């Protein structure tokens, strides 16, 4: 399996994401600059955290216009796994690939610590290696991670089982304790916590690795077994 880590000006978690795939998952991965126009050779696309374009205007607001995002849109339409973490999540909502918006944390402060999450849906290509209701501990590092959507959108997310992760002890004010959601098709996941920072016990925990193992499992079952 081959992953792409999209690198925007200001990305700073791309190395962590690359390490998670290459050294912990053991799969092929490339850094792909934001002006790339073709991602056809990749089986999964990863949008890392950071401060793309300095977070000017709004977090992710400028990145949505990058050439690579047109290719990400195409990959999403093809059903390929797309994972956006932190700033990557912000880019996904700005691009319209996921509903809602990320706003300033309720306390208006940057937060950087490990928090408990509850797995709400383990039937996605990103969470099949978890148990439903499982409590996992994943680092957060954000100033604008407060997920917001209107009541109609929230109702739709709940009805269609698109809420994948919830905070056990909401750190930022996110509506309905939301930490991560998928699109209706189930192949685009956005989450504020950083699973790539929890892939080895030496880092303090490895509970984030299952996100990437789930993607690999999906790909093998879909494209290798059926080949």
From Swiss-Prot:
The lineage of its organism: Bacteria, Bacillati, Bacillota, Bacilli, Bacillales. Keywords: ATP-binding, Cytoplasm, Glutamine amidotransferase, Hydrolase, Ligase, Nucleotide-binding, Purine biosynthesis. It catalyses: N(2)-formyl-N(1)-(5-phospho-beta-D-ribosyl)glycinamide + L-glutamine + ATP + H2O = 2-formamido-N(1)-(5-O-phospho-beta-D-ribosyl)acetamidine + L-glutamate + ADP + phosphate + H(+); L-glutamine + H2O = L-glutamate + NH4(+). It comes from Bacillus cytotoxicus (strain DSM 22905 / CIP 110041 / 391-98 / NVH 391-98). GO terms for molecular function: ATP binding; glutaminase activity; phosphoribosylformylglycinamidine synthase activity. SUPFAM superfamilies: Class I glutamine amidotransferase-like. This is Phosphoribosylformylglycinamidine synthase subunit PurQ. Part of the phosphoribosylformylglycinamidine synthase complex involved in the purines biosynthetic pathway. Catalyzes the ATP-dependent conversion of formylglycinamide ribonucleotide (FGAR) and glutamine to yield formylglycinamidine ribonucleotide (FGAM) and glutamate. The FGAM synthase complex is composed of three subunits. PurQ produces an ammonia molecule by converting glutamine to glutamate. PurL transfers the ammonia molecule to FGAR to form FGAM in an ATP-dependent manner. Pfam families: GATase_5.
